[in-house]
Amino acid sequence: MNHTAELEKALTDLRHITGISMEIHAETEEEVTKALEQLKLLSSAYKEKYNKIHFLQSLMTDSIPTYNVYDRAARLHIAPEEPRILYLLETSHSLDEDISEILKNLFPSQSGAFRIPLTEASCAILCPVRSLADSSQETVHLTARMIVDTVNAEALARVRVSYSKTLHNLLDLSTAFRETSLALKVGKLFYSEQTVFPYNRLGIGRLIYRLPTSLCENFLHEIFGEEIPQALDEETTATVNKFLQNNL
């Protein structure tokens, strides 16, 4: 593709993204190259500023000033004050096309849900709550269970899902993300046999997870002395798990 064709394509892309029509008069190869770079930067900056998924990702990580949230949400046609639930999904390997397609079918854009990629192995789903029944703990838990079972059955992939409480404002999204992230970490560590982790049912695992490492090491030394075993036998492991399950 010659530079003139590339320039025309860049102008067309910019018009599709922004609705702005431009004409560029470049006579030399150097001018064309510079114009191409500027157009690509402009398209990229516009996508970043006006892309819904990028906006939600930034909200989840507290990367947008609070005073700017309502204005950005209005420009993107996202209701800032609407009850929603955040689900956090993590796979054992990577989120391939099969899993992405399953999630797309379970939570289509027309439903008002947003599928937000996070890492190669994880994504978030911001799901609207249409009624009081939809926000009940039982319904939310069943939805998380449905995600796990469907992905497991159709993509033959093991996934874990955590979920937040109902958030009523986009400003609460970062808190919900921290809740679900913690639930996933604590769940994997202390309740490895489970695949669904509610934000508010982490038991004693939440408390232990937040203890300083040095305090945990001191406790182990008190129990085992200087020689802390690298692995526990099956009976001891079963006993520890039973204690955790009963918050003892």
Describe each region flagged by the PLM.
Residues 6, 66-86, 90-95, 102-248:
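Cytosolic nucleotide-utilizing catalytic cores of signal-transduction proteins
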Residues 6, 13, 31-34, 179:
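Charged, amphipathic alpha-helical oligomerization/scaffolding segments
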Residues 21, 25-58:
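Short, charged amphipathic alpha-helical surface segments
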